């Protein structure tokens, strides 16, 4: 299956849709999205093999890194450029 994230003018993800599994390259799915829904769509991967992270509503698409990045959590202590994920302290139980 192909997964597509729609982003707004601020590169924020506003929705994520699933495409047909019979479209291996995603070209037909992308064309359908543009023709029927308009907007700006970026392909995302559920297993994170492209664009680092699976897009979620509220994530930001960073075109320089070509990555979907979650909103920074309040307890973030840094950002890992290798994974495009926020570093948060481990919670001890």
Question: What are the functions of these language-model segments?
Answer:
Residues 1-93:
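Interaction-interface detector
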């Amino acid at each position: 299956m192909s997964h597509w994230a729609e982003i707004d003018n601020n590169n924020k993800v506003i929705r994520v849709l699933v495409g047909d599994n019979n479209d291996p390259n995603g070209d037909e799915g992308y064309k359908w999205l543009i023709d029927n829904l308009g907007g700006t769509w970026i392909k995302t991967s559920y297993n994170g093999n492209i664009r680092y992270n699976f897009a979620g509503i509220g994530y930001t698409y960073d075109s320089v890194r070509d990555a979907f990045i979650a909103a920074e959590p309040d307890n973030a202590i840094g950002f890992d450029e290798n994974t495009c994920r926020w570093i948060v302290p481990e919670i001890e139980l």
